[in-house]
């Protein structure tokens, strides 16, 4: 997956102009491709300044690469005894950065655009294309102490 995401991230003509359009409401998903057997979907996410995902694990495996702009990723660890996610660290994810994780609570994170300019990321999920908005994120509660 790392090699495929790196190759895609290096392709400056990967996205059509319409696939780079965001939304003022929240980050916007553009389905780029999906396996006919429902094994994976490839999605571009467009993030305007200030937009962020909820804190979440994943119902399916996933990977992503940053295509343009910079996102901030906060990683969390799951505290089974509290039933909450606890923040571990935050780092910037610049163009070309790649990450991937298995399904479950071992890869809890939050992505967001803290910068002033639009950012675009490319995601590959282990779900059918029509399930991207409902079967990917496993939103969790966060410990604030």
Go through each PLM region and give its residues:
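Mixed-charge, glycine-accented linear interaction segment located at domain edges/termini
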Residues: 134-138, 142
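Short acidic-glycine-tyrosine-enriched beta hairpin
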Residues: 63, 78-108
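Polybasic, low-complexity association/targeting segments
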Residues: 1-15
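A short hydrophobic beta-strand segment most commonly corresponding to one strand
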Residues: 63-65, 116-131
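Asparagine-centered strand-capping/turn motif at beta-strand->loop junctions
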Residues: 110-115
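Glycine- and acidic-residue-biased ligand/ion/polar-headgroup-sensing regions
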Residues: 59-76
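A short glycine-rich, His/Asp/Glu-containing loop-to-beta-strand
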Residues: 20-49
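Conserved short histidine dyad/triad with adjacent acidic residue
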Residues: 43-57, 103-106
